[in-house]
């Protein structure tokens, strides 16, 4: 995530206000406010045209000049996956300049949780868009969060009341791959794509929202995760990867910010770098992924397979158990702006595995980080690993985050007088006065308490890392 300074006093005041708003209350207020007002008009940003000689571009532009309707661009409607992919290919093959001439929004919807009205789906009248509340970081009011590929908003359909994540991508940066994988492959551990709508020169992707934030947000706010929490997350991630890999899909960007908490599961997000292999080995034309989690074979760019995701998961496990990505402690970012050479020469980062890691979990991480991809286990094999299937007596009583929250609420009710007054706040502050032992003893029960409305630690879906 990047932060861009605006230097505007007015913007500072707005950001400061947003940081203290309750998103649920804002949505309720705005819903009542706009009920009797005229729909707001969406103003597309003015962007310069990028000339292109692509034949599809020329065809679309000639139709626009002649005043004829272009397929997929006449309205917002329900459709099939094939319709959505055709829509995505069409808008990615037409220069953004011509979308400024469109009289209204257009798009394809896959799920009826989004309810267009007479072929229209307008901001503020049909759907509300609210910036994510920044719940974890105190970054100062002079900064605006900005993701690498687009901004993400909390969206609520005014008719169905469904709350969603809405990712905004400038049309000149939009690629069909941004929707292909989520549209074509449905699984409980993959964030569901509800549809895509083009407003002006910005594509809006509506998808399933995670109530509990991302793994990265939890790590940055509350420190390292306990091993049973890691087991819970890892099993859900591996189920998603097992499904993707069975379809020969490489995610290419497994990392904490792309794993998002739901109340009863964890899901994978951000498939913009994903590819579906046609052969046993994928030969890349570019470097894909986040380098700190990249496998050695990905860095070499000589071909890799779905096993690259397994290595990235191993690096992610180190991050979850230590609170720090691999390599960073031994090679500070200030001295090493790139880790590609280090990974190429020294991988795997076994020295970064937590000192208090159990033997079983250490064995699993070492297997996932095997340098030779041919010796690296598949997702299905790791799901059977004993580290992820401890004896019943060693497992926590909770089988989901919701049941965990209920158990924790009862415990806190009984021992309320014994708890420090600032326990909820301290779990988010990351105070240096606390010992590492106490930080690791905290569990997802408290950290994700807001899922059931018990605490105010995590509020709503993930921020800009959601993808």
From Swiss-Prot:
GO CC entries: cytoplasm; cytosol
| Taxonomy of the source species | Eukaryota, Metazoa, Chordata, Craniata, Vertebrata
What is the name listed in the Swiss-Prot or TrEMBL entry for this protein?
Answer: Mitogen-activated protein kinase kinase kinase 8
> What's its job?
Required for lipopolysaccharide (LPS)-induced, TLR4-mediated activation of the MAPK/ERK pathway in macrophages, thus being critical for production of the pro-inflammatory cytokine TNF-alpha (TNF) during immune responses. Involved in the regulation of T-helper cell differentiation and IFNG expression in T-cells. Involved in mediating host resistance to bacterial infection through negative regulation of type I interferon (IFN) production. Transduces CD40 and TNFRSF1A signals that activate ERK in B-cells and macrophages, and thus may play a role in the regulation of immunoglobulin production.
Q: Which key words are in the record?
A: ATP-binding, Cell cycle, Cytoplasm, Immunity, Kinase, Magnesium, Metal-binding, Nucleotide-binding, Phosphoprotein, Proto-oncogene, Serine/threonine-protein kinase, Transferase
> Which residues are named in the active-site annotation?
253 (proton acceptor)
Q: Where would you find this protein in the cell? A: Cytoplasm
Q: Which Pfam families match?
A: Pkinase
Q: Which GO terms describe its biological process?
A: cardiac ventricle development; gap junction-mediated intercellular transport; immune system process; MAPK cascade; positive regulation of inflammatory response
Q: How does it assemble?
A: Forms a ternary complex with NFKB1/p105 and TNIP2. Interacts with NFKB1; the interaction increases the stability of MAP3K8 but inhibits its MEK phosphorylation activity, whereas loss of interaction following LPS stimulation leads to its degradation. Interacts with CD40 and TRAF6; the interaction is required for ERK activation. Interacts with KSR2; the interaction inhibits ERK and NF-kappa-B activation.
């Amino acid at each position: 995530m990047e932060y861009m300074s605006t230097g505007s006093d007015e913007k500072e005041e707005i950001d400061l206000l947003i940081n203290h708003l309750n998103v649920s209350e804002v949505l309720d207020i705005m819903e009542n406010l706009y009920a009797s007002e005229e729909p707001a008009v969406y103003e597309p940003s003015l962007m310069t045209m990028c000339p292109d000689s692509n034949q599809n571009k020329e065809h679309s532009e000639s139709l626009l000049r002649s005043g004829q309707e272009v397929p997929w661009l006449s309205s917002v409607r329900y459709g099939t996956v094939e319709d959505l992919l055709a829509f995505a290919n069409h808008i990615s093959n037409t220069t953004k300049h011509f979308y400024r001439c469109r009289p209204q929004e257009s798009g394809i919807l896959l799920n009826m949780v989004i309810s267009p009205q007479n072929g229209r789906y307008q901001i503020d009248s049909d759907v509300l868009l609210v910036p994510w509340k920044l719940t974890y970081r105190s970054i100062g009011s002079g900064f605006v969060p900005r993701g690498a590929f687009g901004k993400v908003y909390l969206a609520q359909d005014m008719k169905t009341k469904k709350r969603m994540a809405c990712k905004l991508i400038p049309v000149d940066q939009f690629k069909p791959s941004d929707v292909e994988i989520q549209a074509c492959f449905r699984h409980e551990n993959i964030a569901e794509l509800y549809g895509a709508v083009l407003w002006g020169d910005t594509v809006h992707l509506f998808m399933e929202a995670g109530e509990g934030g991302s793994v990265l947000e939890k790590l940055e706010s509350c420190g390292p995760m306990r091993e049973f929490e890691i087991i819970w997350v890892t099993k859900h991630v591996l189920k998603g990867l097992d499904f993707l890999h069975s379809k020969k899909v490489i995610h290419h960007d497994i990392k904490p910010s792309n794993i998002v908490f739901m109340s009863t599961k964890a899901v994978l997000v951000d498939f913009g770098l994903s590819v579906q292999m046609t052969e046993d080995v994928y030969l890349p034309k570019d470097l894909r992924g986040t380098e700190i989690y990249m496998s050695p074979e990905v860095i070499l760019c000589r071909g890799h397979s779905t096993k690259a995701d397994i290595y990235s998961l191993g690096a992610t496990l180190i991050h979850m158990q230590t609170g720090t990505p691999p390599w960073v402690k031994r090679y500070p970012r200030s001295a090493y702006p790139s880790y590609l050479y280090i990974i190429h020469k020294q991988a795997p980062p076994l020295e970064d595995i937590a000192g208090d890691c159990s033997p079983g979990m250490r064995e699993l991480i070492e297997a996932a980080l095997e340098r030779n991809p041919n010796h690296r286990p598949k997702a299905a094999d790791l799901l059977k690993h004993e580290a992820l299937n401890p004896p019943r007596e060693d497992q926590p009583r909770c089988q989901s985050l919701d049941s965990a929250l209920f158990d924790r609420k009862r415990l806190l009710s009984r021992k309320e007088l014994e708890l420090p007054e600032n326990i909820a706040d301290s779990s988010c502050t990351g105070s240096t006065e606390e010992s590492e032992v106490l930080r690791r003893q905290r569990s997802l029960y408290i950290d994700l308490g807001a899922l059931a409305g018990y605490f105010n630690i995590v509020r709503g879906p993930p921020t800009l890392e959601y993808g």
